[in-house]
Amino acid sequence: MPASLQMSSFELKEVGTGRFELVGEMSFDTADKILESSRRLFGNYAGLEVDLSQVSKADSAGLALLLEWKAQANQKAGAINFLGMPDSLVAIARTTEVSDMI
């Protein structure tokens, strides 16, 4: 059964095996809570896919979250792919020269 964790300004839900959707904010206000939720939901999947197309607000804390997810996936010898990345995150990644890391 797909899992879902909803907080006040975001929801991270499993939409298929190893496939997740994030809805709401990826910001300084939510990044630590999203990370905590993801640890419970992502489990031991070797491959992950996270749809970000429903993210309504994203800042540099959101980018840091993506980089943390990448690092965690690499530690497990797995992969994580991001779909529908918000333009604001793409711009921050380019400005900070980490776009090749995500």
Where are these regions (language model features)?
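Amphipathic alpha-helical interaction surfaces in cytosolic regulatory modules
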Residues: E25-I102
